[in-house]
Amino acid sequence: MNQDKIVIKGAREHNLKNISLQIPKNKLVVITGVSGSGKSTLAFDTIYSEGQRKYVESLSAYARQFLQMMNKPDVDAIEGLSPAISIEQKTTQKNPRSTVGTVTEIYDYLRVLFARVGIPYSPTTGLPINSQSVSEISDNIINKNKDNKAYILSPIVRDRKGEYRKEIEELKLKGYQRLKVDGKIYEIDEVPILKKNFKHNIDVLIDRLVIKENIQQRLAESIEVGLTLSDGLIYLENLETNKITTYSSKFACPVSGFSIEEIEPRLFSFNAPMGACEECDGIGIEKYFDDKKIIPDDSRSVLKGAIKPWETKVFGYQKKFFVETISKILKEYKVNVKTPWYKIPQDVQNIILYGDQDNEKKFISSFEGKINFIDRKYSETERWWVQYELEKYLSERDCEVCKGFRLNTKALAVKIAGKHIGEITKKSIDDCFSWFNKLKDNLSNNENKIAEGVIKEIKDRLEFLNRVGLDYLSLARASKSLSGGESQRIRLASQIGSGLTGVLYVLDEPSIGLHQKDNQQLINTLFKLRDLGNTVIVVEHDEDAIKQSDHIIDIGVKAGIHGGEVIAEGNLKKILKSTKSLTAQYLNKKKQIAIPQKRRKFNKNKIFTLQKIKTNNLNNLEVTFPLSNFICVTGVSGSGKSSLIIDTLYKRLDEYFNKSLNREENYFNFKGIKNIDKVIDIDQSPIGRSPRSNPATYTGCFTPIRDWYAGLNESAARGYKPGRFSFNVKGGRCESCEGDGVKKIEMHFLADVYVECDICKGKRYNRETLEVKYNSKSIADILDMTVEEGFDFFSKIPSIKQKLKTLMEVGLDYIKIGQSATTLSGGEAQRIKLSKELSKRSTGKTLYILDEPTTGLHFDDVNKLLKILHTLVDEGNTVIVIEHNLDVIKTADYIVDLGPLGGIKGGKIIGKGTPEDIANIKKSFTGNFLKQILKIKE
């Protein structure tokens, strides 16, 4: 066996055509090729799958039950495999407790650091609080009170209301004779009856003594008794100076009594009861019924359905009563019931939503308010569909108790250099790194010795995150809010931090979402992973990554059935010599994406302006977009691109078109809406969550296919309607598997196994339905065809052919018509959505928004995509793309460049104009790279 190479023999998984190849170990290997050529099939479904399967197989049966079993890929043999780790874009953590800090393990080190050198502070006084042993307390008392008469007191009640008869009786039974009550000493039998509704202080008099050196044993015993009685707290009252000093065996504030039992790493864990905020259980957020969701269109009146929940089936039957009640309130405050909601005075709105708390109006004294009513209904109902319906009106905000820090008061009371752990995690990675660089100066010599190793581990990991362009993120950022590219690079950084060697890493386009400025640092990070003694296989389209890799494997020539072959492999020189390789043709510039000879002009009469933009890190911007243009929004990661386009532009336009009846455009802080009639966000979210969702159902292509089959003579003779050919309803589907085509078998010591349905053989339909055929093909055969095959098959049926044509135009000719939505990548899902829009009739006034549409695309695919997007613009529409790909940016008519950096260091407009304009802006990172591509001289 060759120990220096991974040897693959006869790989036939999916569209791979019995390929055999050798991949060098301990190298950076890039697998490239057009979309659908078989890159991911080779990297993930063959190499990684077999590596993982062999590793899991080596474990005991008991251990295997907790791990996902991988199916054996269709390959004759793979030799020389190492344990494999996959870092995909799809692995974004959905757990709300997962953060950047926990994923990278930085938070674990932070917890240790705060437990070892953190100092607790009193929330009341802001002063540090300390713990002392009995010996330390005794020595302190003797040193500071020598020859003075004093009381040793144990506080039992501190500023609390009550009579405390039972407590005093228990103290009497224990043998205590004197108490100090509200500042006065009493014999225990002579304590006056305490007023129940007044706050009291009760201390047990433990000892009366003159402080001298020779009373150490007696003093220590009294201290120990007092500490035990009051759970770690005693007072020393000097009778000559009348000064009272508080001593604590725990971390306790002498003023407020605030105490911390022990400072251990688990105190700082928001996943442990000891550290988590009691209110939000460590999530950091609370859900509340949002008046903006309950009243989405405030231009409506109460009569016209302003309060949306009353229009639903949950409360619809009570609507008449609700309207009558609110009408009485409005009448009392002299407001017409037909008045739009936004014109109703704020105090009256508050009464309608939250009730009349002060009972100002007797006739509505029992009115609890609509939001309070909905909240109560949500809490009390046991009907899942009612809860589901009401959850639509919930929003999230920071927990009011912990302020979003996730931890309880005790954990947040511990500080290092004036900062608690929550404040550290809220800093950007970059600021956090700077803070730790300066921390040494704020610690004592002893603290530095204790913290040295932990700080090094934290700084190393922060530096890795900086290197891969994630300096703008914070450690507190929830993992579920990260993009696929961000999630992948975070996991990449944590793998480097782990220091593993001899591992096979398989990565899926780690450059996604990364600006060219940070690209080289990412490549250097991959080299570092390789230099640790690992094999790094990367599915990638980035030109720099391909050129700098040790070994390149080009799969092609095209996609689907026309792909699955190794077109070229070897180092860069070898690849460039290949005449068959599309990748080589783009790398040596024989083929390239052309720079437009003429750009569309900025028409001052056809513009759209967004004003007062303060979303996330945007600094009160005003941005003008020229319509009927191809516009690119650029900038480094975290600069505010998505905040501007997705969270502001799309959100405001969507609200205007879909929720408002008669609002003026000034209300939404924009101008020029007359030139836009709809906005469409073509994002990368799945086209469906169920395996039954597929390209045919999403694009509407399946409807004419079912109609066609229902119209065949055989169907007419049998009385079959279009519903007969649906696998979602009873009738034509296989009832054994309910139209899924597979059955789930539960295994006791193995992962669940999905096996082909033995009745329909994976066809989804029953035998009678499958007997209806068109040109010898059943409905199941159609779903199993690729888009390209389907296009040829239905070439004479325009209603079907046209929808399949648009899928081919966006480069998806290789996917199957009935391919499960769960197996599609984000880029494929986005292009399916784009094809659906292309199949609609263009109005010429549509605004299309796309976020990184080149994700997962080869140079040749990008070329095809650009032609489609520019065609949309030629029809009068406007296309705005958020993009890092310079081949796309250079073809733009207009660019809005944000920066200069990410997070709080971003959010500003660095430049706007044509690519040539941006290239001449020295402080623009995007401009610096454009200058090289456009060949603009200084």
Predicted regions and their residues:
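Conserved phosphate-binding elements of NTP-dependent enzyme cores
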Residues: M1-E938
